[in-house]
């Protein structure tokens, strides 16, 4: 068009085309953090398909060590977070007879992300449930920990409503004293919504680009309306 926003190409296939196989576009990357190595399946348009993004890297560095029981990786993308948690759990507790229970649930709205997430679990010999869900609409049960690098884009457009709706509903999916840990760009002050809708919130760490927040799923005390920053 005149604004050079798009172009149209027309061609004719003369040879017999190869049958479409989704796995032809699948890639596998090895990530490493704090002596933990894990495999991640990727595909075009899937978040973190090429490398561990800086925000998720900061989040994983500051996750609690005692994550167990039911864990939700919300907006999981390729399953980077859940796979790290699962592999670290196996590394921390090598004896299966003395290993605490860990049940991973991975949710996303994006079909290719869900496909990659399932592949990522398989690559790391992990068990988990991969759930197609618009926000938390199809996610069932309550979790001891919800972990996320929530999206704030829909396509190429900025959309803060995704994270806001998630935070409004998150406490209903946490057990009492359950934890919600997320990373966000520093200019996105999710702590206010976390404090209001989830429970007492603190900033675990921040740099010049990202901040990691953690909230505890209880009702705040009267007058408690300011998140705490760890000293």
Stretches found by the model and what they are:
Residues 1-4, 41-43, 200-208:
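Conserved S-adenosyl-L-methionine
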Residues 4-68:
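SAM-dependent Rossmann-like transferase core, predominantly class I methyltransferases
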Residues 7-28, 206-231:
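Core SAM-dependent methyltransferase catalytic element
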Residues 54-148:
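Conserved SAM/SAH cofactor-binding pocket of Class I
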Residues 145-157:
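A short SAM/SAH-binding and catalytic strip from SAM-dependent methyltransferases
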Residues 164-176:
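A short glycine-rich, Lys/Arg-flanked "PGG" loop and its adjoining helix->strand segment in the class I
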Residues 177-184:
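Conserved beta-strand signature within the Rossmann-like core of class I S-adenosyl-L-methionine
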Residues 185-198:
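Conserved class I S-adenosyl-L-methionine
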């Amino acid at each position: 068009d005149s604004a050079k926003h798009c172009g149209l190409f027309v061609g004719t296939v003369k040879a017999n085309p190869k049958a479409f196989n989704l796995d032809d576009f699948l890639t596998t990357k090895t990530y490493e953090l704090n002596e933990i190595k894990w495999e991640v399946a990727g595909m075009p348009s899937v978040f973190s398909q090429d490398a561990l993004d800086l925000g998720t890297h900061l989040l994983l560095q500051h996750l609690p060590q005692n994550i167990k029981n039911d864990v939700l990786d919300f907006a999981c993308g390729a399953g980077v977070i859940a796979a790290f948690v699962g592999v670290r759990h196996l590394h921390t507790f090598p004896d299966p007879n003395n290993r605490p229970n860990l049940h991973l649930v991975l949710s996303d709205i994006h079909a290719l992300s869900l496909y990659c997430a399932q592949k990522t679990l398989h690559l790391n010999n992990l068990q988990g449930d991969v759930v197609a869900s618009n926000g938390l609409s199809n996610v069932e049960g309550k979790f001891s920990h919800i972990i996320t690098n929530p999206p704030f884009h829909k396509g190429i457009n900025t959309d803060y409503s995704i994270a806001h709706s998630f935070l409004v509903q998150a406490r209903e999916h946490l057990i009492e004293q359950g934890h919600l840990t997320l990373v966000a760009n520093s200019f996105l002050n999710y702590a206010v919504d976390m404090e209001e809708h989830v429970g007492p919130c603190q900033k675990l760490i921040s740099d010049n680009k990202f901040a990691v927040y953690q909230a505890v799923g209880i009702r705040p005390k009267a007058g408690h309306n300011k998140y705490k920053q760890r000293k």
